[in-house]
């Protein structure tokens, strides 16, 4: 079976592309990136996954992202190397950003159409070359694609424009699950909320109905009871559960104290205290953001004020403190962050 790797943008159009591709492929792994260095980081992850895969046939699908010349050349060169190892790999980039025009003219696999959104390009391309898994899904998929197209190219008279605006805000503000710590879960959460739109597309007042129900739909998607639990508690419980599944990979040690390291979670007070209460084998919780700022929390088992002073030129309280990492190297890879923290702790 062909293995598909789908890299897409982090806005409504980008995620809608992946909602579409999941209707055509069973064996698919999705990745998302904003522009800049994250694109190269995700391409590297895909190539690494191919190198480790036992499959022999692959499709790399890139949507709603325009690669620069260096990124396109790197991807093509690496694919050629894999092909020499008897791996059948196809590349297809489907985009609509005019900034990719020059690169599109240099690579046959780079398709550019500035008149349609990426979701519509992806849908029409896949419909032409592959069979949809459930043909009945076209009854909601096609109008959903048209809705995304209307709002993405800002056709105010287009189909579902107002509903598309609600969806655009939904994607932008659905940050309950951190993208860097919970990549798959974050994506699946957004795709689930987007797919829920199929139940509203044909309602008379669809934009208002979906907008009114969205908060409740979010609670349900996060595994909570919308009539009995607050979003704060539902979100914290969901995140704590996911963090607990990562205990082995995210453990760090400072002297005789065991800590949990997260990256770019932000606003950790409620989450950290809940995590430490439910996981008493941990003495402290720490979160590092993209600028190297450190937040530390404890529950009486570790003096994080002293830890922060010794390791991060910071301070605060025994159970709540903060600091900053000197010479911090930003990364889109959690392992890189953890290695920096381990180096600091080992040298403290």
UniProtKB/Swiss-Prot annotation:
Matching Gene3D superfamilies: 3.10.310.30
Coiled-coil regions listed: none
pH dependence text: Optimum pH is 4.0-4.5.
Enzyme Commission number, as recorded: 3.1.4.17
Cofactor: Mn(2+)
Key words, A-Z: cAMP, cGMP, Hydrolase, Manganese, Nucleotide-binding
Superkingdom as given in the UniProt entry: Bacteria
Temperature-activity profile: Optimum temperature is 30-40 degrees Celsius.
Reactions accelerated catalytically: a nucleoside 3',5'-cyclic phosphate + H2O = a nucleoside 5'-phosphate + H(+)
Transmembrane helix in keyword set: no
UniProt-recorded name of the protein: 3',5'-cyclic-nucleotide phosphodiesterase
């Amino acid at each position: 079976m062909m293995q598909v790797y789908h890299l897409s943008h982090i806005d409504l159009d980008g995620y809608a592309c992946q909602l579409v591709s999941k209707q055509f492929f069973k064996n698919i792994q999705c990745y998302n990136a904003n522009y800049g260095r994250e694109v190269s980081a995700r391409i590297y992850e895909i190539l690494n996954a191919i190198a480790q895969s036992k499959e022999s046939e692959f499709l790399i699908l890139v949507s709603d992202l325009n690669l620069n010349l260096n990124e396109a050349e790197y991807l093509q060169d690496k694919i050629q190397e894999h092909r020499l190892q008897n791996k059948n790999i196809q590349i297809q980039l489907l985009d609509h950003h005019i900034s990719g025009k020059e690169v599109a003219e240099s690579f046959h696999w780079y398709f550019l159409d500035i008149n349609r959104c990426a979701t519509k390009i992806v849908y029409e391309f896949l419909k032409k070359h592959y069979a949809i898994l459930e043909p009945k899904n076209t009854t909601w998929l096609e109008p959903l694609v048209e809705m995304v197209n209307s709002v993405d190219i800002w056709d105010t008279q287009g189909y579902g424009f107002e509903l598309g605006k609600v969806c655009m805000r939904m994607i932008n503000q659905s940050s309950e699950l951190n993208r860097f710590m919970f990549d798959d879960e974050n994506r699946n959460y957004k795709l689930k909320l987007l797919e829920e739109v199929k139940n509203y597309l044909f309602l008379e007042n669809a934009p208002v109905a979906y907008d009114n129900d969205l908060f409740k739909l979010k609670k349900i998607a996060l595994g909570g009871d919308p009539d009995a639990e607050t979003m704060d508690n539902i979100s914290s419980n969901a995140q704590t559960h996911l963090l607990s599944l990562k205990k082995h990979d995210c453990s760090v040690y400072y002297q005789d104290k065991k800590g949990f390291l997260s990256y770019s979670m932000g606003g950790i007070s409620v989450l950290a205290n809940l995590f430490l209460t439910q996981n008493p084998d941990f003495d402290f919780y720490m979160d590092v953001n993209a600028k190297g700022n450190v937040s530390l929390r404890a529950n009486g088992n570790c003096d994080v004020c002293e830890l922060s002073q010794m390791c991060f030129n910071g301070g605060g309280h025994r159970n709540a403190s903060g600091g900053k990492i000197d010479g911090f190297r930003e990364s889109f890879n959690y392992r890189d962050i953890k290695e920096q923290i381990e180096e600091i702790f080992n040298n403290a």
